[in-house]
Amino acid sequence: MHLIFCGTPHFAVPTLEKLIAAKFAISLVITNPDEPSGRGYELKAPPVKQAALAAGLEVYQPAKLKDPATVELISRHRPDAIVVVAYGHILPKWMIDLPRLGCINLHASLLPKYRGAAPIQWSLIRGETVTGVTTMRIDVGLDTGDILLKRELPIQDDDTSETLGEGLSQVGADLMVETLRRLEQGDLQAQPQDHPQATLAPILKKEDGRIDWNLPALEIWNRIRGLRPWPVAYTRFRGKNLHIWAASRPAAGEGVQLDPGLLIAEHGRLRVVCGQGTVLEAKEIQLEGRKRMPARDFLNGTKIAPGEKVE
């Protein structure tokens, strides 16, 4: 089977590497252009490009997929299938129609749940205990194509979008290999999605990180897990942003009759009153302009006044 692979971030690298190890013939790897990075704004290659070049594969980095030169180059490869993993662009119809076995996407949720750009983050934010990956045939909609295979992965209490993404990338890589092998053998039939059951996972915005302390502590804890490494959950403290990188899983309602946002600093612990009588303990924080640190270290250098709040 001859493939074209489309992908960009680290999440896509395990799939590319396992397809190579499984001896699929990958004639072209398509990824985003290099982007400026760091203080010096030096161009940095996407992780998929780095992995592809290390494997001796041809790499193409078009800014657009509809210009004539790109259409001609991709069409010339005549792929049996195009594999898409977190590429970052919507494929045009000419490209969807090109391969005989279709364009096969790896999506980091159990479709039709969490269609969109941020399924890993939203599965955590919504408090899911199980998620997974889906291989699907791409159509002209947003993650609406027919499903090929699914595989579940439990969500652990200590998972963040970083750790969950790493786990899903490995599970998804194996699932893509299985999907392509079964398509090649002709024993895999795609099934339509149950569209009325669809939920969305839109791209995150910076303002999504702002914590509403009127919510129950469990909901806030889930947001903290899901919003790493960007935009990171934050609140306002003494006129500055205070990012909360990690917190302890809250206990059931503690019956605290205090105002949401009130800080409780005692015995080296930093806790915040939340909605419905609950309390959240922050474990790792970062005040604007300072480095990340354990909450205990923050309290060693910052005295919390009685009645002081975050907002």
Placement of each model-derived feature along the sequence:
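N-terminal glycine-/serine-/threonine-rich beta1-alpha1-beta2 phosphate-ribose binding loop
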Residues: P36-D80
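Conserved beta-strand segments of alpha/beta enzyme cores
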Residues: A25, G56-E58, G102
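Short beta->alpha connector loops
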Residues: T8-F11, A63-K66, Y87-I90
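An anion-binding loop in the catalytic cleft
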Residues: N214-E311
